Design a protein with these regions (language model features):
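Feature captures the catalytic ectodomains and active-site-proximal regions of enzymes
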Residues: 1-515
């Protein structure tokens, strides 16, 4: 019997809003999605805030989105858990933080705080950095240095100067801390093994090699004057501090999201790990007490301050146990999301699951190649579907998010159009096989590229995302959330929803098993 696959198609960063100005989703030519929305059951679902386990009003992101989708439940996120610890006072009693502080005291050394200095809430929170400074002060430390990674992606591209001002004000108020270095996240938080980027930030922190400054705010302003904004600010060290990382120091990495923290943390704690990829750091620091906010990866050798919500019986595990075959496919930028994050933040092999990784193009920024590798993802997916092997497919098209982050509207418009073209071809193939597509997104981005004043807006949004079900015999409920997608797929597969999932099927009138 031929397979009739269920294909979950995630259009990363494809949100919905009525505003047209700066809205690449509305400005792009999208005949395929327009037709699908007019023909098939369509609704909108929540992808931000409390429905996905974030604080109220907090924009969603790819990690959060895919974890909620794969778990089939509301997944309370790292940001929420750590905020709760700060509020309830358990943050300052955290054993891993206190162990790092004891290490500093015993060695008469320095405490370094790494982190994305931003209130974006995607990778970090500046409030957590301030909480660490307060803890250091309470514990009597004097040599405390912040290595600030500038955002400009999940927040306004030129907001870094204000975050640095606020950090300086907090240091003055608390009575401890100096800014030791500044780096755009493009360098310090690379995740694609572009070691030339990472090395610039690492060498600044460990050797004061490269650019230097004496006034942090002026360093950023000078960068702005050269049209280089937060994300891309060249790493530089403060000549007026003794903030170089040395033997016997301690480091607390305040980022809670793993994917863009792994490389830098691995290089510091496990310096030979990337030797087979052609990179080892120029200098190694010994006897470093290293603390991650959350678990990053096994390659990172250090303590973990907080444990993530344990997710049993995720969608992938559940359908595997039922004997179904599944395919996960995405290009590099979103591969971790359809595997690691979709599986509950665990990198694991699942029986009956195949993974296809399509390399993302090697360009500086994706506005230079808005199509990214979407056509290759689409072609490989169609090739896989022709094999008649898979009951379920999870595919991610990265373009709307990754190009949306550049803030370049014409490029984002092209990105949306390319995704539409690919969705159209995938739909034709799935339809020819008698299968069903669920087309949705993990969060918004490309639909808002200008703020209210007409300035570039490069962050994610709190807007709803679409859900299209390509079956005219069914209807969809309104008011859903990302955590309802796994139960919805199980409903389509004719499988019961496991107790671990608190999401609900969004199908109103399903009486037949489709697979």
């Amino acid at each position: 019997m031929k397979k009739r696959p269920i294909v979950l198609c995630i259009l990363d960063g494809y949100g919905l809003t009525s505003r047209v100005e700066g809205n690449a989703v509305k400005l792009a030519n999208t005949p395929n999605l327009d037709d699908l929305m007019s023909i098939y059951p369509t609704t909108v679902i929540n992808a931000s805030g409390e429905p996905v386990g974030l604080p109220d009003g907090q924009m969603g992101n790819s990690e959060v989105g895919h974890m909620n989708i794969g778990a089939g439940r509301v997944v309370y996120q790292s940001l929420t858990l750590i905020n709760k610890a700060v509020k309830e006072g358990t943050f300052v009693k955290n054993e891993k933080f206190l162990s790092a502080i004891d290490h500093v005291k015993e060695n008469n050394s320095k405490l370094h705080i790494w982190g994305l200095l931003s209130n974006g809430g995607v990778h970090s929170s500046n409030e957590h950095i301030y909480a660490l400074l307060r803890l250091a002060k309470e514990q009597g430390l004097e040599k405390v240095y912040v290595h600030a990674f500038l955002d400009g992606r999940d927040v306004a591209p030129d907001s870094g100067v204000d975050f640095i001002k606020d950090l300086s004000a907090q240091m003055d108020k608390i009575g401890v801390g100096e800014i030791a270095s500044i780096s755009g996240r493009y360098y310090a938080m690379d995740r694609d093994k572009r070691f030339d980027r990472v090395a610039l930030a690492y060498d600044v922190m460990t050797q004061k090699k490269g650019e230097t400054f004496t006034v942090p705010v002026q360093y950023i302003r000078d960068s702005y004057a050269n049209k280089v904004y937060d994300e891309f600010v060249i790493p530089g060290s403060n000549r007026n501090t003794d903030g170089t990382i040395e033997d016997n120091d301690a480091i607390i990495f305040a980022n809670f999201r793993p994917d863009r923290a792994i490389q830098m943390a691995t290089i510091m704690t496990n310096p030979d790990f990337y030797s087979d990829k052609g990179y080892v750091p120029e200098v190694r620091r010994n006897n470093i007490q290293f603390v991650c906010m959350m678990k990053y990866a096994d390659s990172v050798k250090g303590d973990i301050a907080f444990s993530a919500m344990k997710l049993d019986n995720t969608f992938g595990d559940y359908i595997s146990a039922k004997g179904l075959k599944q395919l996960r496919i995405a290009e590099t930028e979103k591969y971790a999301h359809v595997t690691f994050f979709f599986d509950g933040g665990i990198d694991k092999e699942i029986e009956g699951a195949k993974r296809d990784l399509i390399n993302s193009p090697k360009v500086a920024t994706y506005d230079l190649q808005p199509e990214m590798s979407a056509y290759e993802v689409k072609d490989k997916l169609i090739e896989e579907l022709d094999k008649d092997e898979f009951d379920v497919v999870i595919v991610n098209f990265a373009n709307c998010d990754m190009v949306g982050h550049t803030g370049i509207i014409p490029a984002a418009i092209k990105a949306v159009s390319v995704v539409d073209e690919c969705v159209g071809e995938v739909y034709e193939k799935v339809s020819s096989l008698g299968g069903t597509m669920l087309i949705t997104a993990d969060h918004g981005n490309a639909e808002r590229l200008l703020d209210e004043e007409g300035n570039p807006f490069t962050a994610h949004t709190t807007n709803v995302v679409p859900l299209i079900l390509t079956n005219t015999h069914l209807a969809l409920k309104d008011g859903g959330k990302l955590g309802d997608l796994a139960p919805t797929m199980l409903d389509l597969l004719g499988l019961p929803i496991p107790n671990e999932m608190d999401g609900e099927s969004l199908i109103l009138n399903n009486e037949t098993c489709l697979v």
